[in-house]
Amino acid sequence: MRHAHPTNIVVHLRPIDQRRIAQLRERTETPRTSADVWYIHTVLTQCFLPYTDQKDRRDWTRQNGTYSIILTAGAIRDPRHPREVREVGLPFGAKPRLFQSYANTQAVKQQSPVIPVERSMTALMKTLGFSITGGHKGTIASFKEQITRFARCHFTVVAPGPRGTERYINAPPIKQFDVWFPANTDHEPYWPTEIVLTDEYYSSLKDHAVPYDFRALKAIQNKPRAQDIYLWLTQRLCRIPYNKPLLMRWKDLYAMFGGQSTLKKFKQNFPADLAAARASYPEARIEEHGEGYLFRNSTPPIPKTKVIVKK
């Protein structure tokens, strides 16, 4: 068994991955400001969105321990054909992940379920670190589609119930979401002035908000699995008992982070994603193990403080 110090974790990586991880570490070495502290609901650090397009699939589920999340794709009214309803797919990739973090962060910092949004879609995309390109296949169109999918997706949390039952909890995060479509179809569509979280989600968020360094997620915006690993590490390592490390076998890691890949492919790619996540979390104490990885109690990147609610 070998301790995985910050430099050891990249020993088995390709040279190009080692260079990328060194660059990620440099980006977060500067002092952190309050603007760099973002928040995410603890459930979203344990049950994740798809990594790739699920095409015509209308549902998605992931399990972590005794909890599961079920996503069901929604639909919208096509503004070009008011009498028709268009199905939208499941959200996937980095864009909806960063958007949900933005919404959670604004709710916590503003202490309100009513979230002010940047004045335009491009302004919000720049805040999240995405490049801006137009056209049918550009990043603006892709971002709009992913956020629409996220806003219309139905969330269900499955938790242990009494006497061996399973409890299904409907937990849609967004209650209201307005999109303005300008009359000029060539004009760039503007983002809504605000979105509104459901009362239930906002109440839960106040008690279960996990702080993290947004620069870490922004630096790995093209690696959604690495983003998920980073967020999971931020809330999980600090809760592991000092004298009882957590062994995550490959099958357990695959169940959480595998997505649609095969186990063989996952085992090839996971070390690079873990190294990318750890580049911004050098305090993470992780050891390679023949059956997977051993995780030890570690100081969180940002200490959790209770969210104070204004009366």
Language-model features and meaning:
Residues M1-K311:
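Charged, alpha-helix-forming regions
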